[in-house]
UniProtKB/Swiss-Prot annotation:
Keywords: Cytoplasm, GTP-binding, Hydrolase, Magnesium, Metal-binding, Nucleotide-binding. The lineage of its organism: Bacteria, Pseudomonadati, Pseudomonadota, Alphaproteobacteria, Rickettsiales. GTP binds at residues 166-173, 191-195, 212-215, 279-282, 308-310. Its cofactor is Mg(2+). It holds the Pfam family GTP1_OBG. It comes from Anaplasma phagocytophilum (strain HZ). Coiled coil: none annotated. Mg(2+) binds at S173, T193. Its main location: cytoplasm. The keyword DNA-binding does not apply. This is GTPase Obg.
C-alpha cells in the first residue's frame, strides 16, 4: 500500500430542503388553512480520527466529498428528513488547512476526535410558518440554503514516541525490525526506506511507538534525497534516536550533517532530546569503538550508545522508555498549581 501523506479534496455540505406551500384539504373543513412543512437540513461532511487508517490514500480516489441533501417539506406540516452526515475516517495526526501552506483549521490528534469540515445548509420554511392574524392563507415559502463546494488540504504527521533518524544505510530499518518485528525492507544500499514506517515495542506493559524515516543527506532541507519530505513525521516525536554507521571514517562529520539538516528544517526539531547510537560496531575494532564514542560524546555532549548486530536491544529500549517516563513526569509538574492542591490554603490579601 502506498504511503500517501498529503491530499487535496473538495468538500460540500448537503443543501437544505425547500419549504412547502400546502393547504389543508379535508371533508367538511372549508378553510383548512396552510399546512406546508419545513425542509430538512443538509448533512455535514465530518472528518474523524481513527486508528484503523494509516494513510490518506482514500482521498486519491475520492476527491469530491458531498453530504446528502435535506428533503423538502410536505403537507400536513410534515418536515423533510435531514440529510445524512458524511463521516470520513482519517489517520490520527491529520491536519487540515484552508490552502497549501495556509492556516491550520483542524488538528485531529486523538482517536475519535471529529471536525465538521463542511456544514449542511438550513432547510427552508413552509407556508404554515407564515400564517398570521392578517394573512390567513400565505403562499410564501423559502428555499433551502445551497452550499458551495470548496477545497481543503490535508497533511498527515504520524504520531510516535521516538523518531529514528540518520544518514542512508545507517541501519535504521534493521533496528526498527529488530525492536518491533516490523516488516520493513532491509538491504545493503542507500535509500532502502522510501517512506516512513512505524513499529511498536512492548516495554513494561507500555507500547513504545518508533518511526523510521528515509535517510537524510546534505541539502535535504532544500529537497535533496528523500528524507526532507518526511521530516514532518518526526516533529511530534518526544525523542530522537540518531543512528550513525560505526564504520564511517568521519564520525563527527556524519553527525553534524544530519543535525544541520534538522536545524535548517525546524528549530524545534533540532532542539528535541536525542540519543546517539553508534551502530554496526561489529564492523570495527574495540579501539575504534572507544575512540569514536568519545569523539561523539565530546562534540555533542549527549548520551552515546554503542550497538552491534548481536547485542540485545532490551537495555536500549528500557533506557528510552525511562527517558519518556521522565519527560511525562516533568510535563505534569509544570502543570501543577500549588494553589489548587488539596490541603493548601492560599493566604488572603490583608485589607488596608
Amino acid at each position: 500500500m502506498s504511503f500517501i501523506d498529503e491530499a487535496k479534496v473538495f468538500v460540500k455540505g448537503g443543501n437544505g430542503g425547500n419549504g412547502c406551500v400546502s393547504f389543508r384539504r379535508e371533508k367538511y373543513i372549508e378553510f383548512g388553512g396552510p399546512d406546508g412543512g419545513n425542509g430538512g437540513d443538509g448533512g455535514s461532511v465530518i472528518l474523524e480520527a481513527s486508528s484503523a487508517v494509516n494513510t490518506l490514500l482514500f482521498f486519491r480516489y475520492h476527491q469530491h466529498l458531498r453530504a446528502e441533501n435535506g428533503k423538502s417539506g410536505s403537507g400536513k406540516k410534515k418536515s423533510g428528513a435531514s440529510g445524512r452526515d458524511l463521516v470520513i475516517k482519517v489517520p490520527i495526526g491529520t491536519q487540515v488547512f484552508d490552502s497549501p501552506g495556509g492556516s491550520l483549521i483542524a488538528d485531529l490528534s486523538t482517536v475519535g476526535q471529529r471536525y465538521v469540515v463542511a456544514s449542511g445548509g438550513k432547510g427552508g420554511v413552509g407556508n404554515a410558518q407564515y400564517k398570521s392574524s392578517t394573512n390567513r392563507a400565505p403562499v410564501y415559502y423559502t428555499l433551502g440554503a445551497v452550499e458551495e463546494e470548496f477545497p481543503i488540504f490535508m497533511q498527515l504527521k504520524v504520531l510516535s514516541d521516538i523518531g529514528i533518524i540518520g544518514m542512508p544505510n545507517a541501519g535504521k530499518s534493521s533496528l526498527l525490525s529488530r525492536c518491533t518485528m516490523s516488516k520493513t525492507k532491509v538491504a545493503d544500499y542507500p535509500f532502502t526506506t522510501l517512506e516512513p514506517h512505524l513499529g511498536v515495542a512492548r516495554i513494561n506493559e507500555y507500547d513504545l511507538i518508533l518511526a523510521d524515516i528515509p535517510g537524510l543527506i546534505e541539502n535535504a532541507n532544500e529537497g535533496a534525497g528523500l528524507g526532507h519530505k518526511f521530516l514532518k513525521h518526526i516533529e511530534r516525536c518526544s525523542l530522537l534516536l540518531h543512528l550513525i554507521d560505526g564504520s564511517t571514517e568521519d564520525i563527527v562529520g556524519a553527525y553534524k550533517l544530519v543535525s544541520r539538516e534538522l536545524a535548517m528544517y525546524s528549530k524545534e526539531l533540532s532542539e528535541k532530546r536525542e540519543v546517539i547510537v553508534l551502530n554496526k560496531c561489529d564492523m570495527i575494532t574495540e579501539e575504534e569503538i572507544v575512540q569514536k564514542k568519545h569523539l561523539l560524546e565530546d562534540y555533542s555532549n549527549k548520551t552515546v550508545v554503542t550497538l552491534s548486530l548481536d547485542d540485545p536491544l532490551n537495555p536500549l529500549l528500557v533506557m528510552l522508555y525511562e527517558m519518556l517516563q521522565k519527560d511525562d513526569i516533568e510535563e505534569e509538574s509544570k502543570k501543577f498549581d500549588p494553589f489548587l492542591h488539596v490541603g493548601y490554603n492560599k493566604k488572603k490579601t490583608p485589607k488596608i
